Amino acid sequence: NKLGLRTLAVHVDNGWNSEESVQNIKNICEPLGIDYASHVLDWEEFKDIQLSVLKSSIVEVEIPTDIAVLGALHRVAAKHKIKFILSGGNYATEGILPQKWFYDPKDLKLLKNIQKRFGTKKMKTFPSFNFLEEIYYKFIKKIRIVYILNYFPFDKEKAMAVLKEELNWKYYGGKHYESKFTSFVQSYYQFKKFNLDYRRATFS
């Protein structure tokens, strides 16, 4: 609001929200007068896709959510003729994982092949996002992703303190733990199955 932006907050609900994350959305949007849209994924379809990815034993088990978020955000932006998607991605706290720890989170071809092999349902309502769709939204619809936190010194601890003090924001316990699934993946699953401890990258 201080920047004078006319913001539409978009929540992609994949069924794994922590209670704190849901309340945080309300605590931020309502007092600031931010318009809010929720894109709810089909739970039966989405959990079947997630189960397929787990069965495939690839490391990057968050591919379904990563693709769905990009797909939903661009669809909402196109629907409302919005030209800029503001991302919280930043150089200060993101992009820290070793290359061997992750894979392209936008590989829709991989996801479709995994679902075809291990899944029981078709991807009928899943908001896809692939290379051709990225070109369409970027060059035809002129939609750009802006990493706004890279344009000024970003201090995560100070940002969290401001959110807590001014908007009654509550911490959910860890990096990306706003999702119950992500907290399970990063704190247990990837550590036990692949010996990957995200804390090593985060703390270093």
Report the location of each language-model feature:
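Nucleotide-activated chemistry modules centered on ATP-dependent adenylation/adenylyltransferase
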Residues: L3-S204
